[in-house]
């Protein structure tokens, strides 16, 4: 079994080691279908936030302070603004680029001051950057400092799959690399990387190794270096409706540890192949690759297919696993950026049997 406390210690040590130069750090969790990526990410988030909340309660912090940005941050300067024709197409569903891996996301200015980043999946897979709020009290009593960034929300919607040249194959292979808005997920990674690389403008004097005795020193440094950053919202995936839902997740100003979770974070194909470089550019990252026996995940995924209503029997679930999930799981092993790039670092295998 995984030692979650050890993983939490590693995550906090990554934050401690970079607290002087990076506002945020990135942790990537990858693995085949059924390996428990989501569960690992959720437990990691809960345990990190619980430790921080315990610290706040022990230190009697009524609220935490947030400093303004010392200079403006441009998160979308590399993107074109969608013209009127393109905006009209986006509002109508935006299906013309659904299979275009080379489509470059565009930005759309909203009436509320927010900026939408739209890729080939249209509004269903859009990323929203919200304007800074003007309210006087912006500080909750127990903010979360860890946030999950799941890849699932970038599944192309079923309506978008209907517009593939071969919609039957698109639906059958849903969950495969080409059935995601990889364009916009990559763009989200680039945006988040920019926020990671912000100088927190706070220089700690605490130790760089996290253990039970000095975690408070790290949390002191974190609490004294919050910056008023724009909120970044992105889609999640609703298994009940089997489609992405816009603005389901948010990275807020208090987020200091990003937990990216998904099947293709290290896949060496099309847009996926650029994610590692985007995250590595922060200089403050680690990837955990979940290793697990294939017969274990076959049973897990088959049962999940039955429970979700995708399949009517365990036998049918196993057949679906072998026709799609197994293929995708083997793909991320054979086509990993680790196999193609000797300069890849900070990627470690962990078992989750």
Curated annotation (Swiss-Prot):
For whether the record's keyword set contains Kinase, the answer is yes
Can you list the disulfide-bonded cysteine pairs?
Answer: none
EC main group: transferase
The UniProt entry, under InterPro entries, shows: P-loop_NTPase
Keyword line: ATP-binding, Kinase, Nucleotide-binding, Transferase
Task: Give yes or no: UniProt keyword Kinase.
Answer: yes
Question: Where ATP is bound, by residue?
Answer: 31-39
Q: Where are the transmembrane segments?
A: none
- The EC number(s) given in the record are 2.7.1.-
Give the Gene Ontology MF terms in alphabetical order.
Answer: ATP binding; kinase activity
Known role: ATP-dependent kinase that could be involved in endoplasmic reticulum membrane assembly.
The record's similarity note reads: Belongs to the YFH7 family.
- The protein depicted here goes by the name ATP-dependent kinase YFH7
Q: Supply the source organism for this entry.
A: Kluyveromyces lactis (strain ATCC 8585 / CBS 2359 / DSM 70799 / NBRC 1267 / NRRL Y-1140 / WM37) (Yeast)
């Amino acid at each position: 079994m995984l030692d979650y406390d050890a993983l939490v210690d590693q995550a906090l040590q990554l934050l401690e080691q970079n607290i002087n130069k990076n506002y945020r750090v990135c942790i990537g969790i990858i693995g085949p279908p059924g390996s428990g990526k989501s569960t690992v990410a959720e437990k990691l988030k809960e345990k990190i936030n619980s430790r921080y909340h315990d610290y706040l309660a022990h230190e009697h912090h009524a609220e935490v302070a947030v400093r303004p940005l010392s200079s403006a941050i441009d998160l979308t300067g590399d993107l074109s603004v969608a013209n009127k024709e393109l905006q009209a197409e986006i509002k109508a569903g935006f299906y013309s680029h659904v299979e275009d891996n080379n489509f470059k996301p565009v930005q759309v200015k909203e009436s509320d001051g927010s900026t939408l980043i739209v890729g080939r999946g249209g509004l269903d897979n859009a990323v929203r950057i919200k304007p800074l709020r003007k309210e006087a009290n912006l500080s909750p009593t127990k903010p979360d400092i860890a946030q999950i960034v799941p890849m699932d929300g970038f599944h192309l919607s079923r309506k978008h799959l209907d517009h593939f040249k071969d919609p039957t194959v698109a639906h059958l292979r849903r969950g495969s690399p080409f059935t995601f808005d990889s364009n916009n997920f990559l763009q989200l990674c680039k945006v988040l990387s920019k926020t990671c690389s912000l100088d927190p403008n706070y220089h700690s004097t605490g130790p760089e190794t996290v253990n039970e005795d000095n975690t408070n020193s790290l949390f002191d440094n974190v609490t004294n270096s919050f910056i008023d950053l724009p909120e970044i919202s992105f889609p999640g995936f609703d298994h009940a409706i089997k489609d992405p839902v816009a603005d389901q997740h948010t990275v807020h100003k208090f987020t200091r540890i990003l937990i990216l979770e998904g099947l293709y974070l290290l896949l060496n194909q099309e847009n996926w192949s650029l994610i590692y470089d985007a995250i590595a550019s922060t200089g403050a990252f680690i990837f955990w690759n979940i290793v697990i026996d294939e017969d274990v995940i076959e049973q897990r995924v088959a049962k999940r297919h039955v429970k979700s209503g995708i399949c009517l029997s365990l036998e049918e679930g196993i057949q679906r696993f072998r026709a799609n999930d197994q293929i995708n799981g083997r793909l991320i092993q054979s086509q990993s950026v680790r196999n193609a790039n000797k300069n890849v670092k900070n990627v470690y295998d962990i078992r989750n049997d």
